[in-house]
């Protein structure tokens, strides 16, 4: 589909039987794939939903979340499941009802607000804007510290980008990100570098 998911949204409203039949097939295949991953020894699985934010509040459950919920139910308590639904931070109740253990969030909202909105019941993953990976190591370090400090004393943060690394991402920026996180402690300051140079 397109970046605004026009064709997919049109199918949802104009041909709902076809839409749901397609998503049921994708969900069934995803469940089989996840079960194979678990059998192969993965420690966690992550479900990526790239279009949840394009859906209205009313359409989100039927058009996306219920299918993620089916995958989570199929996994059961075998391993943790991370749910990442891009742009869906305003759909908290439906997100929680998916049943994940961890919820990822993109960079469009403060990660502490997202954690608070989830009621502090779940770990969160995110949410450095991937555009920073194309800047300088100093910019990456500064923004990473801003996010870590803003998250404060809350528990349950898996630091990550708010979405994938872009092709123009710089290796030195990635190194700065990892080094900043590894050397950060909850007293809001950096400790001496432990990474090889």
Regions flagged by a language model, labelled:
Residues 1-197:
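Active-site loop segments of alpha/beta catalytic cores
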């Amino acid at each position: 589909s397109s970046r605004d998911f026009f064709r997919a949204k049109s199918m949802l409203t104009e041909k709902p039987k076809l839409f749901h039949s397609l998503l049921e097939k994708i969900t069934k295949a995803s469940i089989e794939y996840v079960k194979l991953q678990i059998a192969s020894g993965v420690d966690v699985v992550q479900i990526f939903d790239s279009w949840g934010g394009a859906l209205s509040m009313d359409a989100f459950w039927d058009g996306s979340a219920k299918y993620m919920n089916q995958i989570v139910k199929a996994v059961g308590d075998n391993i943790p499941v991370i749910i990442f639904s891009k742009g869906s931070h305003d759909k908290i109740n439906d997100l929680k009802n998916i049943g994940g253990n961890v919820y990822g969030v993109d960079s469009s909202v403060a990660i502490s607000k997202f954690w608070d909105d989830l009621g502090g019941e779940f770990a969160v993953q995110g949410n450095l804007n991937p555009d920073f990976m194309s800047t300088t190591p100093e910019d990456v370090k500064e923004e990473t510290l801003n996010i870590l400090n803003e998250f404060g004393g809350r528990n349950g943060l898996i630091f990550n980008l708010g979405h994938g690394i872009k092709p123009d991402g710089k290796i030195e920026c990635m190194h700065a990100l990892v080094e900043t996180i590894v050397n950060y402690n909850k007293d809001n300051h950096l400790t001496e570098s432990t990474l090889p140079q």
